From Swiss-Prot:
HAMAP family: MinC (MF_00267). This is Probable septum site-determining protein MinC. GO terms for biological process: cell morphogenesis; division septum assembly; regulation of cell septum assembly. The keyword Cell division applies. Belongs to the MinC family. The gene is minC. It comes from the Bacteria. InterPro entries: CAP/MinC_C, MinC, MinC_C_sf, Septum_form_inhib_MinC_C. Cell division inhibitor that blocks the formation of polar Z ring septums. Rapidly oscillates between the poles of the cell to destabilize FtsZ filaments that have formed before they mature into polar Z rings. Prevents FtsZ polymerization. Gene3D superfamilies: 2.160.20.70. The keyword Isomerase does not apply.
Length: 195
């Protein structure tokens, strides 16, 4: 009998556009794209393929339409030309989730987020504010805030301030169930354990 595994995949579909815009997008966002399949709906230019291989990104070239939920996003030009918001004017609010975040659920927020329940495998959290998880974290977290607080971590899919946590850093989080606070000084991640 043939042994197979079924997987759910999150993907970005990229339609035909200028290679320079695609290359700029890939260079700027390669850390976050590590967790996605990138689907090109055209034949990819060699210089774009070189960047995909350089960052070891998973990609597919196809003209075939794919089924699935679609999330409307900005064009690459709008994304790369968009001015950065001035965060100094308004302090983000805090949103508290007392429930578990299920597999397949995605939360995108400009607020600080506090999770009292578990974040299941296949769930994804992206926040411009600080993130605190006091349950078990098995899902993906992308935090752009000043700190990331985690208790019991069972995931290697953690990005803090545009930096993917290395295997060594993730291993420090897996050691025990104590609360860990992650901050960043310049380009150095600091992981402190609260006893």
């Amino acid at each position: 009998m043939l042994k197979t595994n079924q997987k759910n995949v999150h993907a970005f579909e990229i339609e035909k556009q200028e290679p320079e815009a695609v290359m700029e997008f890939l260079e700027k966002n390669h850390a976050l794209l590590q967790y996605f399949l990138i689907i090109f709906k055209y034949d990819i230019e060699p210089e774009v393929k070189a960047i995909l291989r350089k960052h070891q990104l998973l990609f597919l070239e196809t003209n075939r339409a794919l089924n699935g939920r679609h999330i409307k996003t900005m064009s690459l030009k709008e994304e790369t030309d968009h001015p950065k918001p001035n965060h100094s004017k308004t302090e983000p609010k805090t949103t508290i989730y007392e429930r578990h975040i299920r597999s397949g659920e995605e939360i995108y927020s400009a607020n600080h987020l506090i999770f009292l329940g578990n974040i299941h495998n296949g769930a994804k959290i992206i926040s411009e504010g600080c993130v605190s998880v006091y349950g078990v974290c098995e899902g993906a977290i992308v935090c752009f805030g000043e700190c990331l607080i985690l208790k019991e971590v069972k995931s290697a899919q953690i990005v803090f301030q545009n930096q993917i946590l290395s295997l060594k850093e993730v291993e420090r989080l897996l050691v025990n169930k104590n609360i860990k606070i992650i901050t960043k000084n310049d380009d150095i991640l600091d992981i402190k354990e609260v006893l």
